[in-house]
Amino acid sequence: MASLLKSLTLFKRTRDQPPLASGSGGAIRGIKHVIIVLIPGDSSIVTRSRLLDRLVRLVGDPKINGPKLTGILISILSLFVESPGQLIQRIIDDPDVSIKLVEVIPSINSACGLTFASRGASLDSEADEFFKIVDEGSKAQGQLGWLENKDIVDIEVDNAEQFNILLASILAQIWILLAKAVTAPDTAADSEMRRWIKYTQQRRVVGEFRMNKIWLDIVRNRIAEDLSLRRFMVALILDIKRSPGNKPRIAEMICDIDNYIVEAGLASFILTIKFGIETMYPALGLHEFSGELTTIESLMMLYQQMGETAPYMVILENSVQNKFSAGSYPLLWSYAMGVGVELENSMGGLNFGRSYFDPAYFRLGQEMVRRSAGKVSSALAAELGITKEEAQLVSEIASKTTEDRTIRATGPKQSQITFLHSERSEVANQQPPTINKRSENQGGDKYPIHFSDERLPGYTPDVNSSEWSESRYDTQIIQDDGNDDDRKSMEAIAKMRMLTKMLSQPGTSEDNSPVYSDKELLN
């Protein structure tokens, strides 16, 4: 039997691994299309600033074709380095495109103020043809046209510091678009604006250089359409991360934005590990999870084998991304989402409307968090050197804190858990709701929220862990023979809570405190 389990583990790991690169054949290359990328031909700030001005205008032209737009965006993205040409040649390895670098220098004879560098030949007319939209469009009207601030005529500067701030403002907006351009382009506007405000408050960008919605939509759509552009952006991020020593300020900003880009599209996998496995609740011992836990283990190993490109597999359209979807481990994912909803309010906005979502295991995760609140793991306590008395103190404090948090919580909470088994479901359907709320301004009794203290099948409490605090959970006494008995039980528990509060007030001596029993309160 041990050999069977070992073979099963090896089988699942082998099945989830991608094929190894081998064989006598070379790399498969597709039919390439040429992309023209403009780079400054000198180190002058005027040249870079003028080139940036012309490129920003070209991006907003709706008639521009896709490959030309991709080349323009690559030119803008590489303007912050000292040698853009060397950077592009070093990191570009795309089987779908062929990059053609063209140097640009100032010219007094061309209408656009720039020309293509050549050995003796004049290419002013070709440069004017390339930048013809500039002269026929917004430049003739005396405005840049693609900024929200319509008072800005152009973005040409002759100072290196001003150019860096201007370029950082434009690059930040492009990089922010990458975070959700592939996964959620239709709902990305709000998060993109929040991040822009963040960098504005940090003085990394200037708010006056905010591009308008039309310009941003064009860039976002191109990022979503063109895999070659995304490959370049990911390669640029990785190249910046690898570079030693202090990095330029724009490079540090790109790394900061990368925190929003990394692992885009892998939320199901990452959250399942975070809430389903790292929390280490006893529910992981269920037989239903054994197969999916092995799947998660093999996926984590595959993630590590993919190396530095693993967090960008969705952005790079890697075919292995489907293995990481929640459909490969639906029960464990549903359970993890239930845990996450209870632990973090931010999880309440997640969309769980998927065909493989299992409500029963979602409620299992919720119930595990509620029933485990205030407990201290014996294994972790032993590792940290926490004594039994300290664990008891932590349990009491955590129970009271969790109770206050539960009352103030605004996330999706279920008022009554009918859970996994039909016996409980039938009883719950026959009984009235056990949660009653009264306003303080209204007459009558106030009934608190009650939680049952039943244990799930297969759940073994940790005997070395601290027990729940009585101030958090009270034993709910429900009788099946009528509503009057239920009301009496709730009134008795409410009175018991009031007496407990009175006894815990300052100045009350423990020696003179009367002892009350549940039977006396129920009579």
UniProtKB/Swiss-Prot annotation:
Region (Ntail): 404-523
Superkingdom of this protein's organism: Viruses
Short name of one Pfam family: Paramyxo_ncap
UniProt cross-references to InterPro entries, sorted A to Z: Paramyx_ncap
Subcellular location, record wording: Virion; Host cytoplasm
Region of interest (Interaction with the phosphoprotein), residue spans: 477-503
Domains as described in the record: Ncore is globular and carries regions required for N self-assembly and RNA-binding. Ntail is an intrinsically disordered monomeric domain in the C-terminus.
Descriptive protein name: Nucleoprotein
Native source organism of the sequence: Canine distemper virus (strain Onderstepoort)
Gene (name only): N
